[in-house]
Regions:
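Extreme N-terminal basic, low-complexity initiation segments
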Residues: 2-4
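Short, polar/acidic, helix-capping and beta-turn segments at strand->helix junctions
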Residues: 16-267
Length: 267
């Protein structure tokens, strides 16, 4: 078993009670929200560590991206286990089977790096599909890692989530207002996603006031509820980035992620 301490918190939102379990990934210097095998719900730096983010000028195909990430971490004198989050771009939404197959391939490198084990994955992730100018194959847009520091800055990254509650059954059975992109349907989808963001932050001891960046991924209009549902709760204190992209699985329409990171680089 992995040497990871666990803490269970029961969290509340408009959608009911969400039970989120956190664990510490000691080799990486961060704690994370336990999730499915392909990603964790989010990560936060442990005392003595800070999270830094690097964005590639041009997205790199997965294999090339992993090589560049490995080279960057080694240049920084950091272990591969410091890798804690990433942002991917894919050509088009996957079928459910295609998404599972991609994820199994993706976690293979994490397993070789000593991060993924026993279907436990501490790395947070978002994966979306640009509607304009998509990559030819799944690619890395950005990645995050921990660095040792004298004073913890409370940095964190919340994984991307769309409007499908995690659980049993296929995506079509879980997607909120499947096939409906009306204003009210998009509001309902967004409310669920906002709820997930807030509960994940709460599980890591964070709120919107601790965030430095909030991103929405959708190709549909959300202006009709932008102020009432997003601005009013403090989700855009540092502005909001709208990426014109679709979530990674067919049928999903609205995704978000959030981070609180003080050091960001472009390479």
């Amino acid at each position: 078993m992995l040497e990871r301490g666990c803490l269970r918190r029961v969290l509340f939102c408009d959608e009911g009670i969400l039970s989120m379990e956190t664990a510490i990934f000691e080799p990486g210097g961060y704690r994370y929200i336990r999730g499915p095998f392909q990603y964790s719900g989010g990560v936060a730096a442990e005392p003595g560590f800070s999270i830094e983010r690097v964005r590639f000028r041009t997205p790199l195909a997965i294999e090339d991206g992993f090589l560049r990430i490995e080279a960057h971490l080694k240049k920084m004198g950091l272990p591969l286990t410091s890798f804690c989050a990433c942002e991917l771009r894919s050509p088009a939404p996957f079928t459910e089977e295609g998404f599972i197959n991609f994820n199994r391939s993706y976690v293979g490198t994490l397993e070789r790096w000593g991060i993924f084990r026993d279907d436990e994955n501490p790395v947070a992730r978002s994966n979306v599909c640009p509607a304009v100018g998509p990559p030819l194959e799944p690619s890395f847009q950005a990645f995050s890692y921990t660095v040792p520091v004298a004073k913890c800055d409370g940095s964190f990254v919340i994984a991307g989530s769309a409007e499908a509650p995690e659980g049993q059954g296929n995506y079509n059975a879980r997607i909120i207002r499947l096939g409906d992109q009306s204003s009210e349907a998009m509001r309902e989808k967004a409310l669920y996603v906002l709820c997930v963001m807030e509960n994940r932050m709460a599980a890591l001891g964070k709120t919107w006031t601790n965030s430095t960046a909030t991103t929405v991924y959708t190709v549909y209009d959300f202006h009709t509820f932008f102020e009432d549902e997003i601005v009013i709760r403090g989700a855009v204190n540092n502005g909001l980035t709208w990426v014109y992209a679709r979530p990674p699985v067919e049928g999903l329409d609205f995704e978000m992620d959030v981070r609180g990171v003080l050091t960001e680089l472009i390479i």
